[in-house]
Structures are given as C-alpha cells and as structure tokens.
Swiss-Prot record:
DNA-binding span(s): 32-51
Organism: Escherichia coli (strain K12)
Listed name of the protein: Putative aga operon transcriptional repressor
Domain HTH deoR-type: 15-70
Statement: the UniProt record of this protein carries the keyword Transcription regulation: yes
Pfam families with a match to the protein in the record: DeoRC, HTH_DeoR
GO BP, sorted A to Z: regulation of DNA-templated transcription
Length: 269
C-alpha cells in the first residue's frame, strides 16, 4: 500500500506525523489556518487547535484567531506576507480598527503605520473630513484613496514587497518636518520588560522615528502578540500612551500595562 496520497504528499498516520507536517508548512508559508488544516488532514478543528497549542508550548508557533504564525525565534528569515496576515484575526482587527477610528476627529494629523490592522483603520476613514494622514504602507494608502476628506501623505522610500511597506532614509527624512497628533502603530511582538518589537530592522528604525514626531503613540494589535519578543526593539512599553487590543490579552499583561500608565481599550470580536 502506498504511503502517499493523490497529491504525492506523504500520508499522515498519526498525531506526531501530522504535527511534523504542520511545522513544515509553518516554515514554508509563515502561517497556517485551522480550517485549511482540518480539511487537509481530515480531522476536527478542535484537534488542529490542540496541535497548534502543542506547537505554541514548544516555542514553534504563536496562535492567533483562525490559525497560527511561525515564531520569529524559530525561523527568523520567514515573515508572513500581508495576504497571510490579513487572513488571520480579521474580525478582531476590524473591532480594533473601529475603536481606533473613533479617536480621529476633524483637524487631526495622524500616522498610520503599515500593516493589516492599520489597513482596516484606513478602510473606516472614508467618511472622515479635514484629516491629514501619512503612511508608509502601500495597502493603507490604497485604502485611503477612497477617503476624499483625508489629505494623504506618503513617506516614500524603498518598498518591501513582503510587507507592502516603505522604509529607508527617504522615508525617515520625510517625517522630520511634521508633527502629528497620534500614531497608530502595528506591532509584531509586545513584552512588558522588553518592549515593543518587530522582526525587521529597517521598519523598527522608521517606527522609532514615527514615535518621535507623534504626540500620542497608540498601539493597535491583538492578544496573540503579547509575551513575545522579536529581534528589533521599537520602544519601551512605558512609552505607549494607549493600546487597543482584544479581551484575550493575558491578565498579567493587562495589569502590567495599567501599572505602567498605559491606557488600555479592550474590544470584543
């Protein structure tokens, strides 16, 4: 009897083999989705979630709503694409974005960092008026094209296709003559002691520059990013003015943020 299926992939005969294949997919793709894996292996979504929970305990993956991402420390060279990130936590990102966009009032000058959560904020700004918005995200800028009442500024610079974001000296210099009311900052990892961090050095440098020219730093994220640390630090946790996050945030992280003087806005799905 053949040990391969119709696609030529080795047939999974047990839990260990299935988990090994999931690890391979994480390393190849950067992310996986529960429903896809359930259909692929012919097991329940509960079984797949248990697999992902096991991999998270092993430090291989970090769970998110709808799937999981590869840990940066496991495969530093793998970064999920914008498309992969967009497929995860979509409902939660939209809830976070809805809370964030309510903070933007006529006359405000805002920075929208690149990312999938800030993209959702941009989508909700279509009816805003008398707002100036600068971004380094190509997908964010495209979403703002339909917001006729928003004056759009781009940082320019070198384009990272993987994240659809601009970076570099030109991007950093474009910020130096501006002062903004608020920055909406998307992040890859948050740790109370190690601060806010990301996997890309160039983006971390640009993010630090954004923080310098913004009156308020507002982090928009989901709870899966907590108790994680990526290679390149952006800022200390204490520098965050506000964080908008889902109710799944770990209790110790929530307590620590509030003790640090960070205003926390909790949202449901």
């Amino acid at each position: 009897m053949s040990n391969t299926d119709a696609s030529g992939e080795k047939r999974v005969t047990g839990t260990s083999e299935r988990r090994e294949q999931i690890i391979q997919r994480l390393r190849q793709q950067g992310s996986v989705q529960v429903n896809d894996l359930s259909a692929l292996y012919g097991v329940s979504t509960v079984t797949i979630r248990n697999d992902l929970a096991f991999l998270e305990k092993q430090g291989i993956a970090v769970r998110a709503y709808g799937g999981a991402l590869i840990c940066d420390s496991t495969t530093p060279s793998v970064e999920p694409s914008v498309e992969d990130k967009s497929a995860l936590n979509t409902a939660m990102k939209r809830s976070v974005a809805k809370a964030a966009v309510e903070l933007i009032q006529p006359g405000h000058r805002v920075i929208l960092d690149s990312g999938t959560t800030t993209f959702e904020i941009a989508r909700l700004m279509r009816k805003h008026t008398d707002v100036i918005a600068m971004t380094n995200g190509m997908n964010v800028a495209n979403a703002l094209l339909e917001a006729e009442g928003v004056e759009l500024l781009m940082t320019g610079g070198h384009l990272r296709r993987q994240s659809q974001s601009f970076y570099g000296d030109q991007a950093e210099q474009s910020l130096q003559n501006y002062h903004f009311d608020m920055l909406f900052l998307g992040v890859d990892a948050i740790d109370l002691e190690r601060g806010v961090s990301t996997h890309n050095e160039d983006e971390a440098r640009l993010n630090r520059r954004m923080c310098e020219v913004a009156e308020r730093i507002i982090v928009v994220t989901d709870s899966s990013k907590f108790n994680r640390s990526s290679l390149h630090k952006i800022i200390d946790t204490q520098r965050i003015d506000m964080i908008i996050v889902d109710e799944g945030i770990p209790a110790d992280s929530l307590e620590g943020l509030r003790k640090a003087g960070v205003e926390v806005i909790l949202v449901g799905e």
